[in-house]
Curated annotation (Swiss-Prot):
Name of this chain's protein: Phaseolin, alpha-type
Purpose of the protein: Major seed storage protein.
Residue ranges with Low complexity bias: 417-426
Family matches, as SMART domains: Cupin_1
Domain Cupin type-1: 245-396
High-level lineage: Eukaryota, Viridiplantae, Streptophyta, Embryophyta, Tracheophyta
Leader sequence segment: 1-24
Single GO MF descriptor: nutrient reservoir activity
PTM notes: N-glycosylated; glycans consist in Man9(GlcNAc)2 and Man7(GlcNAc)2 when dually glycosylated at Asn-258 and Asn-347, whereas it consists in Xyl-Man3(GlcNAc)2 when solely glycosylated at Asn-258.
Length: 436
């Protein structure tokens, strides 16, 4: 009898150990999320809205649900659209302003206007992925998207700004297996009077009975499209595409990386594209007003953000660090200093909220360095000396040791790094920002 109990006891111990390990892992992941509320891991932060053999639509979880510290982003959502070659995203409208960036492939965007007009735009990644007017979709505008390329997939990142509430609603005219047409929700007599037709005809032409749709309608909101239709759409799109807006872009770059920015004043949004070579460092900097949402398109990077510790009012600073990879998202609050080091060739798409009258302030580097500007303001080498432990002359000498700007060589000596880390540990717990 005793022998029979031993295996059962061992099984019980193993079960409890497994349960404990699982709980510990879950708790650790939750703590990591709480410790860094600005980091959205691609593995568990994207929710799929629709998926079939031709592509998918997915949305990043709401920013304010990740952390109360991101509640100023509650009216913004990030959406990703991917589609296979020669496909069509069926006509729809959304209760949100949309900004589109093509991150791979090419697209034909068609906007349907109420005065019997259509606007066609041909968008490619090669068009420096910065928004212009033709990549902005006003709320409530019916639009559809085509991937005209016979070989390459299409990937679009869009920033959505709801006009009703934090939830976004996409209204599709089509009736498919994935969803029904919103027109079907109107009563029979409303439809008959509106179309001046019998309901049976309306149902047959617009909706079809379940199981009677044509094959193309059963595939969902992303469907295949034949080459003849693509060719016709391409003619209109190419003739209607606007000229390049490159002169309006603010581009900064060197051998280590490039930054291109543009502000859409009508939407108060900054749009940026960042490309960095492996080993490059985007020196510490901050944005004066804009809250920047970074999306990793390709590659990997290490990011360090400095901000107040925890959710409570505190005078202590904390470093929020993350290892970023493809499809990860990182939020940079206004006035929070940040540095990015490329651990491989990497590129980002960035959206800056509250961008009007925003300034980017660098804390290191040869040009646009606000610390060195303190010395020029008020004839202020003495001010620098009062600000830091060294004299103003020593501070300027230290700053001038870095001959690069914005993007610099991120490699450094390990011994120096270890020494600096020890000194940083000694300084932890000291007061940082005033909170009021």
């Amino acid at each position: 009898m005793m022998r029979a109990r031993v295996p059962l006891l061992l099984l019980g111990i193993l079960f409890l150990a497994s349960l404990s390990a699982s709980f510990a892992t879950s708790l650790r992941e939750e703590e990591e999320s709480q410790d860094n509320p600005f980091y959205f891991n691609s593995d568990n932060s994207w929710n799929t809205l629709f998926k079939n053999q031709y592509g998918h639509i997915r949305v990043l979880q709401r920013f304010d649900q990740q952390s109360k510290r991101l509640q100023n982003l509650e009216d913004y959502r990030l959406v990703e659209f991917r589609s296979k070659p020669e496909t069509l995203l069926l006509p729809q409208q959304a209760d949100a302003e949309l900004l589109l960036v093509v991150r791979s492939g090419s697209a034909i965007l068609v906007l349907v206007k109420p005065d019997d007009r259509r606007e066609y735009f041909f968008l490619t990644q090669g068009d420096n992925p910065i928004f212009s007017d033709n990549q902005k979709i006003p709320a409530g505008t019916i639009f559809y998207l085509v991937n005209p390329d016979p070989k390459e997939d299409l990937r679009i990142i869009q920033l959505a700004m709801p006009v009703n509430n934090p939830q976004i609603h996409e209204f599709f005219l089509s009736s498919t297996e994935a969803q029904q047409s919103y027109l079907q929700e109107f009563s029979k007599h409303i439809l008959e009077a509106s179309f001046n037709s019998k309901f049976e005809e309306i149902n047959r032409v617009l909706f079809e009975e379940e199981g009677q749709q044509e094959e193309g309608q059963q595939e969902g909101v992303i469907v295949n499209i034949d080459s003849e239709q693509i060719e016709e759409l391409s003619k209109h799109a190419k003739s209607s595409s606007r000229k390049s807006h490159s002169k309006q872009d603010n581009t900064i770059g060197n051998e280590f990386g490039n930054l291109t920015e543009r502000t859409d004043n009508s939407l108060n949004v900054l749009i940026s594209s960042i490309e960095m070579k492996e080993g490059a460092l985007f020196v510490p900097h901050y944005y004066s007003k804009a809250i920047v949402i970074l999306v990793v398109n390709e590659g990997e990077a290490h990011v360090e953000l400095v901000g107040p510790k925890g959710n409570k009012e505190t005078l202590e600073f904390e470093s929020y660090r993350a290892e970023l990879s493809k499809d990860d998202v990182f939020v940079i609050p206004a006035a929070y200093p940040v540095a990015i080091k490329a651990t491989s060739n990497v590129n980002f798409t960035g959206f800056g909220i509250n961008a009007n009258n925003n300034n980017r302030n660098l804390l290191a580097g040869k040009t646009d360095n606000v610390i060195s500007s303190i010395g020029r303001a008020l004839d202020g080498k003495d001010v620098l000396g009062l600000t830091f432990s060294g004299s103003g002359e020593e501070v300027m000498k230290l700053i001038n040791k870095q001959s690069g700007s914005y993007f610099v060589d991120g490699h450094h000596h390990q011994q120096e790094q270890q020494k600096g880390s020890h000194q940083q540990e000694q300084q932890k717990g000291r007061k940082g920002a005033f909170v009021y």
